[in-house]
Amino acid sequence: MEPTAAPDDSSSDHPERRRGPSRRTVVLGALGAAVVLGAGIPVTLRLLDRPTGKLVTPLLASKPFYAAHRGGSLDWPEMSLYAYQQSVAHGIDALEMSLARTSDGVWFGLHDPTLDRTSGTDAFVASEHTWAEVQQHRILPQNTVDHRQPSRPYLKFESLVEAYGTTHTIFVDPKVVDPQYYPELFALMTKLVEKPKETFIAKGYGFLPAWAEAASAEGLQTWGYYYGAEIEAESDRLVSTQGSWSILGLDYEATAADWTLVRSYGKPVIGHIIPSKAAATTALGHGARGLMVSGVTQVLG
């Protein structure tokens, strides 16, 4: 029997607290800061010796490539504009966003059905509230390595795409949204960028391929993430679902045998969810093409 929801894709590691900026960080006093128009949020300028982002075709031709899980969920309040700005400043190749949809049809970054974990609310179901009501809350830093940093506003999907849709691949996971709204999401993607196939990759839990099948029909690349322990328990479900995904994913803690099995399908494999350089080294050693990274400052430094 298939599960009704994907398991939590949070990192299980807790790396040491973030250290100061590396010697390659741009010195703001010398070079100034970029300011997001209309938001007034200072952004660290891109590190000078890092590449810019990659759209889908060059991303999948790269090895390794790096995607920011929820914008870098160990470092900054997840899926906030600030998190994505900082990941881009660190030279990340791609960005990832889980999506919820408000009662008035606004798509925004949220991993859960409610704001409870991210904002400390009590049974605040996103789909039952308007965007104006969501905006009354902030994303807390309690799930990051620096609990003292400021909380941040929730971010519309279209705002993320407007900022980075022409420079960075965006992994899109409508994790808690009813499939009846998928056509609406595809229409929004098409409206926001000229070439959706070069901006978006549909991301989802490997054992639940409905999103992949809908996205494939739109011509999008798809990434299905799996866990080694689940594959070992139900290997037949990997066999029956992997064909729906053009890219596969496996957790870095999976065994070498699990990695060999997943790689045997001849598709690119993304290691997840990477909190540290040690985890990155492990996944790359198993043959990962790319990494879905929660600890951006840990991995990219």
Please give the residue ranges for each predicted region.
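Conserved, mostly hydrophobic/aromatic
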Residues: H69, S87, S98, V134, ...
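Long, acidic (Asp/Glu-rich), low-complexity accessory segments flanking structured domains
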Residues: I41-L74
